[in-house]
C-alpha cells in the first residue's frame, strides 16, 4: 500500500498545516499517510473507499481522514478536491482541544463523512484562500494567524455540517442524501421521500441532478451497485442474495445494471478479475 509522507507535502518541518488542491482528482489507489487530512469536495462525483467502506461523494462532501485511515478514489467524474493537511494536535503552538470540533469515534463507528451546503462551501473556499495567502513566517503573530484560520475552518465545517440541522433546500438535500446512504436497500417512493425532507418532488429532482449529475433513481441505483460490489468483494453471500440485500428485486436485472455501471459482471468481481496490478 502507498504511504504518503508529510515531508513531501508540508512547506517546512514545523508547518502544522498545508493545502493541496486536486483539480481534478483522478482515480488513486489505496493509501494512507503519516498526517491527518480534511478532504473538501468542490464539485464532481466519485467513489471514496474509506477503510474498506464505499461512499458516494459529490460537491459539499467533507471527509476527515486520520493518520491511520486508509482510503482510495475510483470512478471519478470531474472530481475536484481541496485537501487541508494537518500534522497532529501536538503540532500547533496556540491551539488546544481541537478534537472537540472533529468527528469522534464511538463504539467502533467513526462518522468520517459530513456534508455542507453550497453557501458554506463558498465560505470554506474563502477561508482556504486566506490560509494559502497567509505566508510562511515563523514569528509568533504569523504562526498564530495561520492557526486561527485553521480553527475558523473547523468551526465553520462543524456549524455547517449535517449534524447542526437544516433549513434551506440545499441542506435538506444533504440530509436526504445521507438518509439514502443508510436506507438504500429499501423500496424508495420519491414522492414520500420528498415530503419527508420538506422538498417538492421537482426541487428534489433538480437539486440532486445538479449535485451528482444523475437523476434520483440513477443515483439510488449507483449507490446500490456500489454497496453490492463491496459485498461481492468482502462477503460470501451469493450474487442473488447480494442483489436482494442491496434493493434489487431481480438478480438478472441487477447483473445487467452492474455490468453497465462497472464493465464487469458480478461474477468477475467475485473472482477478483477487476483487480488492478499495483
From Swiss-Prot:
Entry annotated with the keyword Signal: no
A GO biological-process term: rhamnose metabolic process
Keywords: Activator, Cytoplasm, DNA-binding, Repeat, Rhamnose metabolism, Transcription, Transcription regulation
Molecular function in Gene Ontology: DNA-binding transcription factor activity; sequence-specific DNA binding
Coiled coil regions, renumbered to chain: none
Annotated HTH araC/xylS-type domain residues: 174-272
CDD domains linked: cupin_RhaR_RhaS-like_N (cd06977)
Location of this chain's protein in the cell: Cytoplasm
Regions recorded as binding DNA: 191-212, 239-262
Keyword hit for Transferase: no
Site (Interaction with sigma-70): 241, 250
Major location (coarse): cytoplasm
InterPro entries: AraC-bd (IPR003313), AraC_XylS_family_regulators (IPR050204), Homeodomain-like_sf (IPR009057), HTH-like (IPR037923), HTH_AraC (IPR018060), HTH_AraC-typ_CS (IPR018062), RhaR_RhaS-like_N (IPR047220), RmlC-like_jellyroll (IPR014710)
GO cellular component: cytoplasm
Function, in words: Activates expression of the rhaBAD and rhaT operons.
Subunit (UniProt): Binds DNA as a dimer.
Protein name from the UniProt record: HTH-type transcriptional activator RhaS
Gene source species: Salmonella arizonae (strain ATCC BAA-731 / CDC346-86 / RSK2980)
Lineage of source species: Bacteria, Pseudomonadati, Pseudomonadota, Gammaproteobacteria, Enterobacterales
